[in-house]
Amino acid sequence: MVFILWRCYTRPRLEVYRFGYHYYLSQLIALLVLAPLAIVGIRGSVTAGTRPITISNANQFVNRPVESSVVLNTPFSMIRSIGKKAFVTPDYMTPEQMEATYSPVHLHPVTDGGHKGKNVVILIVESMGKEYIGYFNRSLDGGRYKGYMPFIDSLLTQSLTYKYSYANGRISMDAMPSILSGLPMMVEPFFLTPASLNDVDGISSMLGREGYSTAFFHGAHNISMGFSAYAHSIGYERYYGLDEYCKSPKYGGMDDFDGKWAIWDEPFLQFTLDNIHDMKQPFLATVFTASSHHPYSLPEQYRDSLTDEGGQPIHKCVRYTDLSLRRFFERASREPWYRNTIFVLVADHTNQTSHDIYKTDLGLYSIPIIFFTPDGQLEARTDEVTVAQQTDITPTLLHLLGYDKPYLAFGDDLLDEGRDRGGYWAFSYNAGIYQLVKGDLMLQFDGTKTTAVYRFKTDPLLKNNLVGRLPEQQPMEQFIKALIQQYMSRMNENRLLFNS
């Protein structure tokens, strides 16, 4: 038996393989082919305007966030979330103290109802910092400053707006959760965290349950920035992006693409009106513009008439967007639904700045928030006391529309007549510093202690740090601690709905 086994089994022997140039050439070709494919697979697209896909993109293909696990695979989820514990719940106070100090739950919302059943159009205007608008800056440059948005200047004379209004974030992907769901950016953009798979409500889902038809419009590639996924997750019925634009025979398709991000604002806003015209009333239509953005280019027909001015390349693009908005409103004003509509105009964030007042830690968040009703039912005025922020937009619209059901939002109804005007606040986060604006004070908190307090209304350049010298510091610090703890705990425990 041993002899047979010895004869039948192959005896091991050393063999030396020599690879010729064919082998190395084939491996090089394989690398050159597979490496770009791997990069495209990781990014999700080859276009510059598309961010690498993340776990929140799964929301685009499911009806509820809880179903996202069917779309996601384990290795991808691990790669995208490993080492990303963005939300760590602090232990500043007991849950009871936290609830008593601050709660995002609007249990018994005060409503107006005088605008009940009206349509809503929300225009999120790319990079429309308050510095670009002459209406807010009449004293700049010795009173000579005119800004770059004359149409917005004219609209503001017919609108409700705020002298002290702020963005909650510094990039575009921070804006949608803030404006449409009342969720400010804290530590990391919501889209990029595992919490993006939480159950989230939004003005679209709330109005959808009241019988509104809903649509979201953005002229970039449909998977760009995760906008379509988030819009789907908060209940928008239809999404119109570059794909839908290119299917319309009425427009120029990719000839209207800016070469980097999206369809130029002017044609895309007209395309938006075409589709709003076909929506069943009442409707909620949300539009996110794109042209006032790096690389600061213009459609060919405007390159001679709109030239560089004011020292910043974005200024000519802001003028183009202003012109596009003018033509949007000129055409919208001829629609039968126009006078029965509430328009909201708000920036996603600020951009290039020229004046020192807009280069401060607060000025970098200074944006317009504008409510306009063509029928004049909402009083046109500039509120010079109330502090407003992006997360206040959903509660304020719900007030106007008579929505009286409980909901959750990290913002307030700006039109609550029973509210002390000095009690409104705005929150932002940047590079490890939490920032709270309330009354006439701005407080900066590093997660452990207050590092700065400024009277920003009388010290707009934030030169006089009053930390440790004001009695208001302690209650403001307690408030921001409760706000942070509420946000972190709700993110980690998937409690972003009222009934959760």
PLM ranges: what are they?
Residues 2-7, 42-43, 74-91, 445-447, ...:
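Juxtamembrane/interfacial segments around transmembrane helices
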